[in-house]
Amino acid sequence: MTNINSDSGKINIRTMDQFGLTMQFKINKTTILEKLMSAYCERSGAAIESLEFRLDKQPINKMDTPELLDMEDGDVIEVYQKNTLYS
């Protein structure tokens, strides 16, 4: 039996900053991660230019999708403040 309200194309992703604070997002596997990044910034009040998003220690491109990165339900994206002191 097929569930019409199935979320089979969606996954839950958590973000975690350097202080251990987390946020939960539910997005389609084909949604560009820029949307998640923008939503994170809106919730946290941070400017997207001041942050770096990483998956398994590797930087994430705004145009990447969970599908492209082989992300699974429950994966965690790390969020770091960019070091702008010497840039």
Please tell me what each predicted stretch does:
Residues M1-S87:
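Ubiquitin system architectures
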